């Protein structure tokens, strides 16, 4: 039996894409329709995955622990030596605008900052470059009631990601490949093990109920600190 998985199918056309993402996005200081958003092919986020992101869940149009999510966002930016382009109150205004412009009460607000557009492809940081700042929102997909009642299946795999998983970077190819291992076998998630120790799922934190207690792997550079878990 195929277990439930979050919606990830490709939209059939631009109109459907706009319904799935929202007609309004934020890009470099401007709110604009999705079809008008343009990013350079020389952007370091495109060439090197040189950027970080954050996802903020929104319930009934109220962002959940938004300050804590923005603090984690800032830590990720510091971790890749990229100055935060906005103060927290500016980020809050971006989140508010995106949330109010979208048709869904429950949403996932996606924020991303890359090191920006360079004039060539070269690994060292450019001397002067303006970060690319992007934001969008999507409907928040939650599991059906029957799935919450019976759970889902998962497979384990060796954690082959890099050594700074505590930073929420856009370099997610290892996560993509590892999760696909589970999807190919009909599982909802792939749980990762590093040297025999549980770290996390490819797209989830792991909490275990053991002898009446809620336990989790200890915080480390191999685990993204979960805002909800805190």
What are these regions (language model features)?
Residues 197-219, 225:
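Glycine- and Gly-Pro-enriched alpha-helical subdomains that act as flexible
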Residues 226-230:
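Feature captures the catalytic cores and cofactor-binding loops of soluble hydro-lyases/lyases
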Residues 2-190, 195, 220:
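Conserved alpha/beta cores of soluble small-molecule-handling proteins
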